[in-house]
Every structure is written in structure tokens, then in C-alpha cells.
Design a protein with these regions (language model features):
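Intrinsically disordered, Ser/Thr/Pro/Gly-rich linkers and terminal tails that flank
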Residues: 2-130, 152, 165, 172-215, ...
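Glycine-rich active-site/cofactor-binding loop and its immediate structural neighborhood
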Residues: 120-161
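PDZ/PDZ-like groove recognition
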Residues: 127-141, 221-223, 390-395, 404-418, ...
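Cleft-lining beta-strand/loop regions that shape enzyme active-site pockets
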Residues: 138, 147-149, 153, 161-164, ...
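A short amphipathic alpha-helical interaction element
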Residues: 146, 400-464
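Generic structural signal for buried aliphatic residues
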Residues: 157-158, 185, 372, 416
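Conserved P-loop NTPase
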Residues: 346-349, 359-390
Length: 525
């Protein structure tokens, strides 16, 4: 074969002939093909990315948001925290729902939410409350670091780690007292009339039991303060204890329980309801309903119980799910005051970066199809709390003296009457009779007998009233007296009304859920 067969001839327009080696011709062709493919792929990728960006940026509902974000980033007179802008825009979007139960949670808020779900936190283990401008220990938790360090009910906290907390709220104080397990915190406290003293407490992991049980005058009292992980198991254990104690009547107490995990509530209902029974419905915005049924056999220990459920304006959400189910499916008796009325359910979505979105996605209805939202559950036996539960908190800086006339004066009269002092008429006028009564109170407590309610007198009145309320649970006592046959339903309702005729009873529907949660002044520390 001749050498010319290994060459390819090419003719240019001018007519010149160029001889190209065939091997290099193939290399050139392959290189051109590869380059073309790469360029095409890059072009497609760029075009695709551009299409995505254009598709997002040109959505009309986001155009203002992008314009504001870009304008601030480009023109604000100082450096901008872009992450803060994004976080606040998400917060604003959720707030735009105008739904008190939907919220976006950042890292810190998510940690608090998880504490409410698990019942675990790191701190000293004490309950505190606001009393005027003071932060008071109401109770150290049993076995807690606070109890082991000698903290007692009534101790006033005046400083934390040498930082004065004068004028602080309980929430602000709690944030300072809490801390990592194994670390120390120094509380400066005042006990009674004593001098301030420092108490060093080593923080630990604290678990808040959601269910407590006690037997009172032959009646089992099971109190549930929240629906968290493990509440159903705790509840079952307490019911079994009541059965072993031989009680026939049991009170399930949901007062001031704001709700929590729905599946825990369903499992608790299952203690009294047979398997495969519908205990509530979930309804989506299109009207489609999903039945939620029990999955296990009922607890044999509950078969012989006479069931009473105690609720009030702070009983919401999962508390109402439980109460509504037993109201529809059993002969349980509901007592107390009308519940809060939260008939919607929230779902959570993790968003990354330790943030979470909680939003309302369904309504819930009782087994009979009742939607209690905004209405609450009306008890069979209405048991309103006595007037002293509604006394206005007295500010020690204010002075109430003879001749003053306002609603707070009536609160002072109710408080002193509750503590055993004769106040005469329950009107709004600070008269000579009240001056004499205040002097008697001051004499009994070795305070200067001015007859005015201010300073130490105001503080002592509120302190003694708190102690009285803590040791006299009126609604619970009313119900136990009725169960034990001392009063009929009508008689116990009338008696409760007689003790609640001087201070206005607010409509619970005017409360927000946060109000219901805050109604109990104690805060787990």
C-alpha cells in the first residue's frame, strides 16, 4: 500500500491542497466533540440554574421580600446580620397567620419546647413565684439539689451569683438560676426575718413527673400537670396504685393543664375505653375526617372506678381531648369550671439549624363530633373558686389608707376576711372599720400599727394568703365532700357560689392559652 493512502487530502477555497496525517485528523475530531459536549453541558447547567433563580425571584408574593432584603443589604448604614434578617422574616411570616398556637422556634426556644415535651431540664429543682416585687421559693422538689442544699418554702431569693435580682420577674430569675449539670449557682436568700445568707447549689438534671397520686378521705386523687413523653405510663401506674388501695371513687385533675402530646392523651383514654373505639376525630381544612382509635385493651384496674374529672379555665387541648372522650363514652362526672376551649392540633417540622416550625394543621372533635374550640367544656357540677383566689396582688410601694376607694380595697377586705379578720362590708371604701382591722393584723404580726396597707403589711398579707391558698384547695375539697355524701350537687354548687360573691369572676374565654398557663404562679426551676 502506498504511503499516500495514510493521508487525507483537503482543498481550501483558494484551491490550495494541504495534506493532513490521518491520526491527527481523528484526534482533532475527537477533541472537538468532547469540547462541544462540555460546553453544551455547562450551558445547560447554567441555563437550568438561571431558570430556577428566575422562577423563584419572579414569584410575585416574594418580590417585596427580596426587594427589602436586597435594599437593606446594599444600602443600610451599618453592616447587616443577614441571618437575623432571615430569622425575623420567618418569624413575621408565621405571626401573619394570627394563630396563637403556630410559632417558629429558634435554637433557644426549641430547647425550651423539648423540655416541655420530655419533662427534663438542668437546674436546681425548685418552684418559684412572683410575690409583689419579690421572687419566692414555693417548694423545692423532692430529692432535688435545692432540697438537699436546705432550701425551704417561703425563702426569698434576693441575688444569684452575687447579682441582685431586685425588680426581676420569675422568668428572668429562672434563666439566671438554670445552668449546665454539674455547675454551681449561689443563691442569696432571706428566710423570715433573718439576715441574707448564701446557699451554694450544684445543678443537676431534673425530671418533672407529670402525674401525682394521693388518697384523700377515701378518694383517689390523680393530678396531671402536662402531657409529656411517658405521661400515659405514669398515669397507668397511679391508677393501678389507686386500685390496690381499694378506692372506688377517683378524681382525675386537669386544672391548669395546658395540654401537650396528643398520643399520650389517647393512650390515657385507652385506660378506660376498650380497644378499637373512636376517641376523637381529626378534621382537615377540606372537611375530611380521620378517626383516632384506641389500640390496646382497657386497664382492668379501672373497671370499678367512679370517675370524676376536675377542670378549670386553664384546662386546654389534650386535657379537653381526654375530658371530651370520657364525657361522650362513659358516665364520668365533670366538675369545676368551664375549660379553656382549644380545639385545634399542631404539627411540628424540623427546619435545620436547630430550628422548628409548629403550626396548626387540623381541628379535633369529640367522639360525638363536637368541636369545643372557643367554647370549652361545661362541667356537670360547677365549682367556682372562693374570692381569695382572685385577690389583686398588692404592691408594697402603693399606700392604701382610710378614705381611699377602689377595687383593690375590696381585695384587701377579702384577704383579711380569709385570714380570719372581721372587715365589715365588702365594698370598695377604706373606712374606719378597716383601719382598725389592719391595726389588729399589724399587732398580731408585730408591725407598727399605722392602719395603712403598704410596705411590709402588704407583703405579709399576700404571703399569709398564699400559704392559706396552698393548704386549702377549695375546688378539690368541694368535690371530695360531694363524693363522700356531705352535700348534694345543688348544695355544693350553692356553697361554692356563696364563697365567690365579692370579686368578679372573669369569663375564661377571655383568657389566652398563655394566660391559662401563667394562671398557676409557680414556675418549675
Amino acid at each position: 500500500m502506498r504511503e499516500e493512502n495514510g493521508r487525507q487530502e483537503s482543498k481550501f477555497p483558494e484551491g490550495r491542497r494541504i495534506n493532513i496525517n490521518f491520526f491527527w485528523f481523528i484526534i482533532i475530531i475527537l477533541t472537538s466533540i468532547i469540547a462541544t459536549a462540555v460546553i453544551t453541558a455547562l450551558s445547560l447547567e447554567a441555563g437550568s440554574e438561571k431558570a430556577v433563580n428566575v422562577g423563584t425571584d419572579t414569584r410575585s408574593e416574594f418580590s417585596k421580600l427580596y426587594n427589602v432584603y436586597d435594599t437593606i443589604n446594599a444600602n443600610y448604614y451599618e453592616d447587616v446580620d443577614r441571618e437575623a434578617l432571615i430569622e425575623s422574616s420567618i418569624q413575621g411570616m408565621v405571626e401573619g397567620l394570627d394563630d396563637p398556637y403556630s410559632e417558629y422556634m429558634n435554637n433557644e426556644e426549641l430547647a425550651q419546647f423539648q423540655e416541655s415535651v420530655t419533662g427534663d431540664f438542668e437546674g436546681i429543682g425548685a418552684e418559684v413565684m412572683q410575690e409583689g416585687n419579690r421572687v419566692i421559693i414555693t417548694s423545692p422538689m423532692r430529692g432535688s439539689p435545692a432540697e438537699e442544699a436546705g432550701i425551704e418554702p417561703g425563702d426569698e431569693i434576693i441575688a444569684v451569683d452575687d447579682e441582685s435580682i431586685e425588680g426581676w420577674t420569675t422568668q428572668e430569675a429562672v434563666q439566671l438560676i438554670r445552668g449546665e449539670k454539674g455547675t454551681d449557682v449561689v443563691l442569696t436568700i432571706v428566710r423570715g426575718e433573718g439576715d441574707p445568707m448564701d446557699v451554694t447549689i450544684t445543678r443537676d438534671t431534673i425530671h418533672i413527673d407529670s402525674v401525682t397520686y394521693e388518697e384523700i378521705e377515701g378518694v383517689g386523687h390523680v393530678s396531671i400537670n402536662r402531657f409529656q413523653e411517658g405521661t400515659a405510663e405514669e398515669f397507668e401506674n397511679k391508677l393501678n396504685m389507686a386500685s390496690e388501695d381499694g378506692v372506688e371513687d377517683i378524681i382525675i385533675d386537669f386544672r391548669y393543664n395546658p395540654g401537650g402530646l396528643l398520643d399520650e392523651a389517647v393512650s390515657m383514654i385507652n385506660q378506660f375505653i376498650e380497644q378499637n373505639e373512636t376517641v376523637l376525630y381529626l378534621e382537615e381544612n377540606g372537611g375530611e375526617r380521620t378517626e383516632i382509635k384506641t389500640s390496646d385493651d382497657r386497664n382492668d384496674s379501672t373497671e370499678d372506678f367512679n370517675i370524676y374529672i376536675l377542670i378549670n379555665e386553664g384546662s386546654a387541648s389534650a386535657s379537653e381531648v381526654f375530658t371530651g372522650a370520657l364525657d361522650d363514652l362513659t358516665d364520668a362526672t365533670i366538675a369545676g369550671t368551664k375549660s379553656f376551649g382549644k380545639g385545634v392540633v399542631q404539627r411540628t417540622v424540623e427546619l435545620g439549624g436547630d430550628s422548628l416550625l409548629k403550626y396548626t394543621n387540623t381541628k379535633w372533635l369529640t367522639p360525638n363530633g363536637t368541636w369545643i374550640h372557643g367554647e370549652g367544656i361545661t362541667p356537670d357540677i360547677e365549682l367556682v373558686n372562693p374570692d381569695y383566689y382572685r385577690v389583686t396582688m398588692l404592691d408594697p410601694e402603693e399606700v392604701y389608707t382610710e378614705g381611699v376607694s377602689n377595687e383593690t380595697v375590696k381585695s384587701i377586705k377579702v384577704a383579711l376576711d380569709t385570714l380570719g379578720y372581721d372587715v365589715g362590708d365588702f365594698n370598695e371604701t377604706f373606712d374606719a372599720s378597716l383601719t382598725e382591722t389592719v391595726e389588729n393584723f399589724q399587732a398580731d404580726n408585730e408591725i407598727e400599727e399605722t392602719g395603712d396597707v403598704t410596705g411590709e403589711t402588704s407583703t405579709l398579707i399576700m404571703s399569709e394568703l398564699r400559704e392559706y391558698a396552698n393548704s386549702n384547695d377549695a375546688q378539690l375539697d368541694y368535690l371530695i365532700n360531694h363524693i363522700n355524701g356531705e352535700y348534694t350537687e345543688e348544695e355544693i354548687e350553692e356553697y361554692a357560689e356563696e364563697r365567690a360573691q365579692h370579686l368578679e369572676i372573669k369569663d375564661p374565654m377571655n383568657h389566652s392559652l398563655q394566660d391559662a398557663d401563667d394562671e398557676d404562679q409557680s414556675t418549675e426551676e
